[in-house]
């Protein structure tokens, strides 16, 4: 499906590719947004409106260019993201409503559209001039976590009994402050941030300064370099933090996925309804791993493609749930494939803020000495993973699911010749409903892992109360029951081996 495996590129999942795109000077096909036209032609204003989750096409003669005259809606009109044009029409989507000029305007001088002062998931505009733009955003949340009703210990697949630390505490869990924008040309974009996980204080990579740089050619292709999330599963495609829960994945998603790493990537669309990402990277997770610990083969790859057949979108930033209140059924099908040769030395710490250690389905880290028997130590393993996701949204309701497959093979190390290939698979499913539009959202999730070293599962239910009737501030409560979690670290609601109920309350700020 993807013909780009040999091109050293990758997907930009954390950086909003349409940020201040109306200043980019490029239309959907790469033409100037305010192209010079013949002074003899008369203005041809076109009004075009859309609602959240809807795409509207307005017939127009666009052969001589299109100019955004004025925005009339509440949602920002961002060129290439929420408005654009093709050979036969001007289109708007996701609440963008505006008036456009097509054809020539006598003696008109190209004007620079005013950048929006605020863009969701990009933040507030600090600087806007001919040299560049700077947006600032803040994401943070406070969490009360109660694990006191979990079992005190568990027995792994090899008969070892391990004690579980059961927490009850309050944390300002995470602090995330990115700066983003462009410099000298809107094609040259940056996304740089400081990230702190306070529950992991004292651990490696508890505070991270990172980011990426991107050159955007047009809506079909952007090339980036730096740190971003591998597009191994849907939740690492770039819609964070717009999940149903606050910064917590279900156990199957957490178990199978990759994490944040350094590399190069390619991102864009084959068609308005088909998006793609691809990345070549150092390893599955770079947080807390120095360059001296990484091998020199540059052999981690991850690819994804998403098809949105009905509406060409799946909500703002491709979010989970239908806060956007689609009036037409929105659908999505996504496919991901990843491969990496992982070394023992290049693994993040077990309490890393975005830990994605390779574990067996009982929670054991595969590189643990003597795990498979006395004198046996795995130093390297071949990791392959694939996932298929699908979902539908309509009038505040959503149903979304994903199935995962993982293959571990080619074990190398001390006395590893007798270790057979390991295959695991699993799924997650999530359903949600806006009980009170724009205010109260209810959701349910279930997840299961089928592994050679144990089958684990969880169920959870929760609510989101949007205090100001819009995204940005929400109070979240979530009750979960897990059976032998194979994943866990201080920034995650579960410890490894957890069995029993867990409850947490979160107050989230995101602008």
Stretch-by-stretch model annotation:
Residues 1-2:
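N-terminal secretory signal peptides that target proteins for export/translocation
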Residues 21-43, 103-141, 148-153, 273, ...:
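N-terminal periplasmic/intermembrane-space "pro-region" immediately following the signal or transit peptide
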Residues 39-105:
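Extracellular, modular beta-sheet/disulfide-rich ectodomains of secreted and cell-surface proteins
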Residues 112-115, 149, 164, 327-511:
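Outer-membrane beta-barrel pore domains
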Residues 151-158, 265:
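Short Gly/aromatic-enriched secondary-structure transition segments
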């Amino acid at each position: 499906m993807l013909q780009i495996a040999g091109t050293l590129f990758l997907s930009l999942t954390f950086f909003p590719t349409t940020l201040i795109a109306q200043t980019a000077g490029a239309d959907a096909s790469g033409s100037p947004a305010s192209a010079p036209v013949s002074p003899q032609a008369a203005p041809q204003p076109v009004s075009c409106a859309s609602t959240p989750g809807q795409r509207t096409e307005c017939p127009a003669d666009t052969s001589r260019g299109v100019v955004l005259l004025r925005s009339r809606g509440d949602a920002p009109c961002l060129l290439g993201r929420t408005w654009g044009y093709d050979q036969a029409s001007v289109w708007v989507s996701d609440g963008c409503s505006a008036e456009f000029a097509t054809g020539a305007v006598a003696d008109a001088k190209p004007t620079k559209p005013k950048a929006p002062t605020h863009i969701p998931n990009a933040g507030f505009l600090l600087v806007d001039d001919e040299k560049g733009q700077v947006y600032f955003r803040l994401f943070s949340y406070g969490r009360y976590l109660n694990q006191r009703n979990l079992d005190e210990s568990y027995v792994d697949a090899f008969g070892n009994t391990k004690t579980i630390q059961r927490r009850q505490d309050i944390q300002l869990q995470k602090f995330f402050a990115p700066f983003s924008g462009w410099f000298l040309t809107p094609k040259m974009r940056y996304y740089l941030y400081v990230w702190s996980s306070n529950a992991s204080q004292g651990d490696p990579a508890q505070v991270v300064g990172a980011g990426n740089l991107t050159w955007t050619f047009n809506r079909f292709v952007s090339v980036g370099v730096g740190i971003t999330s591998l597009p191994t599963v849907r939740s690492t495609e770039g819609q964070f933090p717009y999940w149903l829960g606050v910064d917590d994945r279900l156990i199957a998603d957490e178990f199978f996925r990759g994490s944040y790493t350094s590399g190069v990537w390619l991102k864009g669309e084959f068609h308005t309804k088909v998006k793609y990402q691809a990345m070549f990277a150092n390893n599955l997770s770079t947080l807390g791993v120095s360059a001296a610990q990484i091998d020199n083969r540059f052999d981690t790859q991850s690819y994804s493609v998403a098809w949105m057949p009905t509406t060409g979108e799946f909500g703002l930033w491709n979010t989970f749930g239908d806060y956007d209140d689609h009036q037409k059924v929105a659908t999505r099908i996504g496919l991901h494939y990843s491969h990496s040769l992982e070394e023992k030395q290049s693994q993040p710490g077990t309490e890393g803020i975005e830990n994605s250690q390779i574990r067996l389905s009982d929670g054991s880290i595969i590189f643990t000495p003597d795990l498979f028997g006395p004198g046996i130590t795995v130093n390297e393993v071949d990791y392959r993973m694939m996932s298929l996701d699908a979902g539908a949204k309509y009038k505040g309701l959503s149903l979304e699911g994903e199935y995962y497959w993982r293959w571990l093979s080619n074990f190398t190390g001390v006395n590893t010749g007798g270790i057979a290939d390991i295959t695991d698979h699993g799924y997650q499913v999530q359903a949600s409903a806006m009980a009170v539009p724009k205010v109260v959202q209810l959701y349910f999730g279930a997840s299961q892992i089928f592994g050679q070293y144990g089958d684990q599962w969880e169920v959870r239910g929760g609510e989101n109360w949007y205090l100001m009737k819009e995204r940005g501030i929400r109070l979240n409560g979530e009750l979960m029951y897990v059976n032998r979690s194979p994943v866990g670290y201080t920034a995650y609601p579960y410890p490894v081996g957890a069995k029993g109920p867990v409850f947490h309350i979160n107050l989230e700020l995101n602008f």
